[in-house]
A protein has these predicted regions:
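Primarily NTPase-proximal linker/entry elements flanking Walker-type ATP/GTP-binding cores
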Residues: 6-138, 145-165, 173-192
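Residue-level signature of catalytic and energy-coupling elements of molecular machines
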Residues: 17, 43-45, 79, 110, ...
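Long amphipathic alpha-helical segments used for membrane anchoring, targeting, substrate engagement
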Residues: 3-20, 290-449
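Short, glycine/polar-rich helix-capping loops at beta-to-alpha or helix-loop-helix junctions
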Residues: 143-149, 230-233
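Short, surface-exposed connector motifs at secondary-structure boundaries
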Residues: 129-134, 156-160, 188, 213-218, ...
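Conserved phosphate-handling catalytic cores of large alpha/beta enzymes
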Residues: 173-176, 181, 185, 197, ...
Length: 449
């Protein structure tokens, strides 16, 4: 996960400062030297780091501990405020025209950044706001680019306008605008061609499209895995074509994350979205304050709540709660809970958003705590059951267990352990409900996840 190493190093810096009653200039300089190295190792631009350290030092030197905050907490606040300022302070959204007019968004970027997939995801995000979208396939060079956009558009329930690969991108863009106006679409998103590297032909094509149709927003998609190259690409696109915002993809991968901290400062353009995975819900609105909180290991509860609201069916959740109270939670409910957890990015993603958890546990610790392979085996066990067995776990006798184990590709001992754990959880749910009903304290129990 991005920023994992940076978060750990910053936490160590703050830990060393917590025992001091007053921050001397020497204390601050020593701490900021470590912060500087941590940021540089995270692939943050040198110029950006230099200015950042200067701003923090000016505020931190000689400050007394105020309002009950210890020095470590005070430095965290100063660093947090500067990180937020560095990434843009305020959240920037795509500016849309009134619904009676057509908003034209042009997507640009290099090949491999995830531009076409991101284009469809943005359409899906804006569709949820009640807009009628049209995607236009303007990439006539890359093999299967048009088909890829059509497949992704279908996933989001968004129409794709295509004229094949024999027409000029400019002509496709103009025809798409006519189609949008004629058929009542109020958002047109142009998926333009990517290149392996920036060249004059590519830039000229984008300029020609902007000259031919009234583009309202030009969004650049860059790959966070490329580090400082992503920052350089943003600066070059802005200078040559003019961009209004950036979408930073693959921030969930094994990347140092420095691009997220550098792009705004270097290009002057805001990050609108960050890609944290493959699903639509993994394209997250970029909130500078929440990202700063994640970097400092303080979690991101607001984003977690929003993910839950977007992915959890409220009616199903209420029905499941009632079944848990009556100890009627069955294997179908187990599958539903697994699906909801997956839609939220998995247990590791959820834990990383909880305050303190991501800071105290490295990625390897989370992996040992949450065995995704073990969860997959348990899900395979449930999927090997018949519908009646899932509804009524009491039906599962030894011969049925043999069949289930064979179907799931596990040994019968694992099936026995899982079913026993499941039954214990159901009993604990019932006991806990009774305790709470009598005014007792809630007890802890482990779900078979």
């Amino acid at each position: 996960m991005a920023f994992e190493s940076l978060t750990e190093k910053l936490q160590n810096v703050f830990k060393n400062l917590r025992s001091k009653g007053r921050l001397t200039e020497a204390d601050v300089k020593t701490a900021l030297k470590e912060v500087k190295m941590a940021l540089l190792e995270a692939d943050v631009s040198f110029k950006v780091v230099k200015q950042f350290i200067k701003s923090v030092q000016e505020q931190a030197v000689g400050q007394d501990v105020m309002n009950g905050l210890n020095p470590g907490q005070m430095v965290i606040k100063i660093v947090n405020d500067e990180l937020v300022k560095l990434m843009g302070s305020e959240t920037t959204e795509i500016a849309l025209r009134p619904a009676s007019e057509v908003t034209i968004i042009m997507m640009a970027g290099l090949q491999g950044a995830g531009k076409t997939t991101t284009t469809a995801k943005i359409a899906g995000k804006l569709k949820a706001k009640g807009r009628k979208h049209l995607l236009a396939a303007c990439d006539v060079y890359r093999p299967a680019a048009i088909k890829q956009l059509q497949v992704n558009g279908e996933k989001q329930g968004v129409e794709v306008f295509a004229m094949g690969d024999k027409n000029r991108p400019v002509d496709i863009a103009k025809a798409a605008l006519v189609h949008a106006k004629t058929n009542g679409f109020n958002v047109l998103i142009l998926d333009t061609a990517g290149r392996l590297h920036i060249d004059e032909e590519m830039m000229q094509e984008l300029q020609d499209i902007k000259a031919a149709v009234p583009v309202d927003q030009t969004l650049l998609v860059v790959d966070a895995m490329t580090g400082q190259d992503a920052v350089n690409v943003s600066e070059m696109f802005n200078n040559k074509v003019g961009i209004d915002g950036v979408v930073l993809t693959k921030l969930d991968g094994d990347t140092r994350g420095g691009a997220a901290l550098s792009i705004r400062a270097v290009s002057g353009k805001p990050i609108l979205y960050v890609g944290m995975g493959e699903k639509l819900s993994d394209l997250e609105q970029f909130y500078p304050d929440r990202m700063a909180s994640r970097i400092l290991g303080m979690g991101d509860v607001m984003s977690l709540i929003e993910k839950a609201q977007a992915n959890i069916d409220e009616e199903k959740a209420k029905a499941m709660e009632q079944k848990m109270k009556k100890a009627q939670f069955d294997f179908n409910d187990y599958l539903d809970s697994m699906e909801q957890m997956r839609n939220m990015g998995g247990i590791s993603s959820i834990l990383n958003m909880l305050p303190g958890v991501g800071a105290k546990m490295k990625g390897q610790d989370l992996e040992s705590m949450v065995d995704e392979k073990d969860m997959a085996r348990k899900e395979a066990i449930v999927l090997s059951m018949t519908p009646k067995e899932r509804e009524n776990p009491d039906l599962i006798n030894p011969s049925r267990k043999q069949r289930i184990a064979k179907g799931a590709g596990v040994d019968i001992a694992e099936v026995n352990r899982f079913i026993k754990q499941f039954e214990q959880s159901r009993k604990m749910m019932k006991q806990m409900t009774g305790m709470v009903g009598k005014g007792g304290k809630r007890g802890g129990f482990k779900l078979p996840f």
